[in-house]
Regions:
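Compact, glycine/acidic-enriched structural inserts
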Residues: 100-127
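A surface-exposed partner-binding patch
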Residues: 1-86, 126
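Short acidic-glycine loop/turn motifs at beta-strand connectors
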Residues: 87-91
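Intrinsically disordered, low-complexity regulatory segments enriched in Ser/Thr/Pro
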Residues: 92-102
Length: 127
C-alpha cells in the first residue's frame, strides 16, 4: 500500500472513515485516501521527519493559511524543525512542496507529485 512507509499512523474510528479533506481532488488523491483511513502520523521516513497533521489541525490552520499563503496552497504537515509541507492545486493536479512558515513564498521548494515527494522527503531533499 502507498502508506506503508509512513510511520506511527493513527487509524481513524470506522464511523469517521468517510472524510474527504480535499473533495476537489476526489477519492483517488493520495491525501484524501490517507485521511480516509488515518487521523495523522509522525516519524522518520528515511533521513527526514514528518508529522501529518490531523484533520482537526488542518481545519484550525485554515484561517491563517488563507491569510498568509497563496490561495491555491494547502498545508498538511511539518518536519518539526522549520518546514511546512503542502501541495498546490493551481493546475488541477496536486504538486507537493516544502516551505518556511516565516517566509513561505520566498522559500518554497517544489517536490513533485506524491511518489517524488516521498522519495525526496526520504532523502531529506526538501530544503
Amino acid at each position: 500500500m502507498i502508506f506503508d512507509m509512513l510511520p506511527n499512523k493513527i487509524k481513524k474510528e470506522p464511523s469517521k472513515m468517510a472524510t474527504m479533506v480535499w473533495p476537489d481532488f476526489g477519492k483517488s488523491f493520495e491525501l484524501n485516501e490517507f485521511y480516509r483511513l488515518y487521523e495523522s502520523c509522525g516519524g522518520e521516513i528515511g533521513k527526514a521527519y514528518i508529522f501529518f497533521w490531523s484533520t482537526k489541525e488542518i481545519v484550525e490552520f485554515e484561517p491563517l493559511r488563507s491569510e498568509l499563503y497563496p490561495s491555491a496552497w494547502r498545508i498538511f504537515a511539518s518536519d518539526g524543525g522549520g518546514s511546512y509541507f503542502g501541495f498546490s492545486d493551481e493546475d488541477g493536479k496536486p504538486h507537493f512542496f516544502s516551505c518556511d512558515p516565516i517566509d513561505p513564498t520566498g522559500s518554497v521548494y517544489w517536490l513533485g507529485e506524491w511518489q517524488e515527494f516521498i522519495r525526496r522527503l526520504s532523502k531529506a531533499e526538501y530544503f
